Structures are given as structure tokens and as C-alpha cells.
Amino acid sequence: MRKRTEPVALEHERRTASGSPSAGPAAAALDADCRLKQNLCLAGPGPAEPRCAADAGMKRALGRRKGLCFRLRKILFFVLGLYVAIPFLIKLCPGIQAKLIFLNFVRVPYFIDLKRPQDQGLNHTCNYYLQPEEDVTIGVWHTVPTVWWKNAQGKDQMWYEDALSSSHPIILYLHGNAGTRGGDHRVELYKVLSSLGYHVVTFDYRGWGDSVGTPSERGMTYDALHVFDWIKVRSGDNPVYIWGHSLGTGVATNLVRRLCERETPPDALILESPFTNIREEAKSHPFSVIYRYFPGFDWFFLDPITSSGIQFANDENVKHISCSLLILHAEDDPVVPFQLGRKLYNIAAPSRSFRDFKVQFIPFHSDLGYRHKYIYKSPELPRILREFLGKSEPGRQH
């Protein structure tokens, strides 16, 4: 290669030096081109190929990086667009907020047969169905005191109904949103209360579990009223207490206010993890964190709740309640902030409606880890209930 190239270059130099007609700009360009070709030929094919391959690899890497950045930008714009669109969607469709508050479509635990409470370890419990209104059917569980569990084996609904007239007090339990009357933490609470000598009657509101109907605040309250009246017809003079948890505290205060207005109050009201009203709870809920400082938060997220007829105004209801009130709240509650429970107590305590009744607030330290739904684990709970409600007397056997 080198021998063939050198004469061409020498001949071109001689022509240029002798002043041939090709001299000038064109000749200079030709000369530069010849020199470049000579250098490439002298260098040989070896070193040039790796440099070209490296350049091609770098171009491919840059292309992939640009493609990744483009895809990330698309994802970012999609998420940002969704973030902005959700408030408008909720404002235009208030029913979405109602579903998020009730969460009745979340049925946990899954695949349990609510007709068989014994599968949940409640072998002294009877399942039945009541009909508060036309086209509405609600599933009910009645757990008798633990001391009766042997006698309860194989008994029918009539036996359980008759048992309500025994000397054991009765707790009507109103659960919170999501899940069913067979939720794990709820079942554990039934067991604790049953072991303390209480009848426990609980049910799924319309639209929850195997209950039929469409959820609403009015409907949930009416379901609770129907079950309370059903109990009172069968309980004689036995004390009947109402226990509400989380969203169930809103149902409980609605119910008790109505009972007090008709002058048939329960013997006591227990509120576990209560809030003041649904607007304040929605604003404090962990789901609202990413939108809490969004411009127009109240207009986008809270006003649709009110327009759907959902208020659960515990702070207003307690001003019209005339029975003993016990509030239980864990300091580490991540769902209903502890401050809302304390605020509700501060509203209720000075109310004139409670001047002849005791109002008590029991906090549970955050170190205990009871959070939103595990107060039933407290070893102090039996003592708290005995002191507040009075020690249960042993009843006659059925």
C-alpha cells in the first residue's frame, strides 16, 4: 500500500512546484485531499475501526438516554394531568366521595360466609336478617355472653332472642366503614365484650356485607334505629348500651340524639376513635395529604360530601344527648386524629345536656400501638368498662 501511494504524492508535489496549470485554489484543495488519503493509507485499517465502533456505541447510548428521558417526561405529564383532573372529576361526580367515605364495596376479609359466624370463632353467635324498610334487608349477629357458650350450641334464633331478656346487659355495636360485621378486629372485640358478660348485637348497614340496599347516612341511621327498637322489645329492663367505632360513631350519635329527642335514650354511649364531623375528618384523613394544600381544597373535596347529604355531625349531636358518654381514643390513630377525639370531648363535657350524666375521655398512649382499631387489646379495657358501666351481674342460664 505504501509503495503504490508514495509516487503519486511525489508526482503531485513536482507538478505543484513546477507551476503546472492545476495550481491555485483547486490545486490546494486537491493537495489537501491527497495528503489526507495518504495519511489514512499509511495509518492502515487497524486503529480507525475501534474509533468508529466507539463513536457508534456512544451514539446508541445517547439515543437510549434520550428515549428514556422522553418516556419519563410522558409519565410525569400523565401523573401531573391525573393529579389536576381528579379534583374536577370529584367535583363533577359527588357520588365518588360518598363511595370513598363508605367504602362498603371493600369486603374484608374475603371469602367468609356471614351466615356462619362460627367460622370466625364465634360459636355462641346466631345470624339472622331484619327488614328495616321495604327492599332493605340487613344481616345481624347476636353473640351471647361467653358463660353461655355451651348452652348456646345448636340453639335456634328464638332461643337467642329470648336470651336478651336475661339479666345480662346488651351492647349494640355499630362498625365503621369498609369490611363487614365479620372483620377481624371487630370479631376480637365481640369476644372481649362477650367474655365480660355482655350480649353483643351487631349488623351490617344496608349495602355492606350481605345486607341489601343503597348506603346513605339517613339509611344507616334508620337501620341502627330499627335494630335498637328490635332489641328493646326483647330485652325488658336490661341495660342497652350503644358502641360506635370510627364512622360508626357518626351513626351512633345520630341514633342517640334521635332516641333522646323521643325520650327513649340508651343507658350509655361509647365512642371509639370518634371525629367531630365528616368534613374535619375528611380533611385530616391520610388520603387527603397530597391534596390538602391544593387551591380550592374545600370546594373540590369537602363541598361534594355535604352536597351528597353526608354530615355525621358528632360535634352538633353531642349537644343534644342526655346519657352517659365514654370516649376511647389512641394517640397514634393514623385514620382519625387523636385531636379530633379530644376536641369532641371538649365540646361535650360542658354541654348542659350532660349535666346529670358522666362524660369521660380515656386516651391510650402511642407506645401501646393500638392505632385506629386495636383498643380491644388493652388489658385495661375490662376495668374501664366495669367502672363506667358498672360490673355485670351473672345471669340465669338458658
Curated annotation (Swiss-Prot):
Primary subcellular site in the record, as a coarse category: endoplasmic reticulum
Keyword Lipid metabolism recorded: yes
EC numbers: 3.1.-.-, 3.1.1.23
Region feature Disordered, mapped onto this chain: 1-24
Membrane spanning residue stretches: 75-95
Top EC class of this enzyme: hydrolase
Annotated Pfam families: Abhydrolase_1
Bias (Basic and acidic residues) ranges: 1-16
Catalytic activity: 1-(9Z-octadecenoyl)-sn-glycero-3-phospho-L-serine + H2O = sn-glycero-3-phospho-L-serine + (9Z)-octadecenoate + H(+); 1-(9Z-octadecenoyl)-sn-glycero-3-phospho-(1'-sn-glycerol) + H2O = sn-glycero-3-phospho-(1'-sn-glycerol) + (9Z)-octadecenoate + H(+); 1-(9Z-octadecenoyl)-sn-glycero-3-phospho-(1D-myo-inositol) + H2O = sn-glycero-3-phospho-1D-myo-inositol + (9Z)-octadecenoate + H(+); 1-(9Z-octadecenoyl)-sn-glycero-3-phosphoethanolamine + H2O = sn-glycero-3-phosphoethanolamine + (9Z)-octadecenoate + H(+)
Active site positions: S246 (nucleophile), D333 (charge relay system), H372 (charge relay system)
Keyword Lyase part of the UniProt annotation: no
Any one Gene Ontology BP term: phosphatidylserine catabolic process
Places the protein is found: Endoplasmic reticulum membrane
Glycosylation sites: N123
Recorded family membership: Belongs to the serine esterase family.
Name under which the protein is recorded: Lysophosphatidylserine lipase ABHD12
Organism whose genome encodes this protein: Bos taurus (Bovine)
Origin organism lineage: Eukaryota, Metazoa, Chordata, Craniata, Vertebrata
Gene: ABHD12
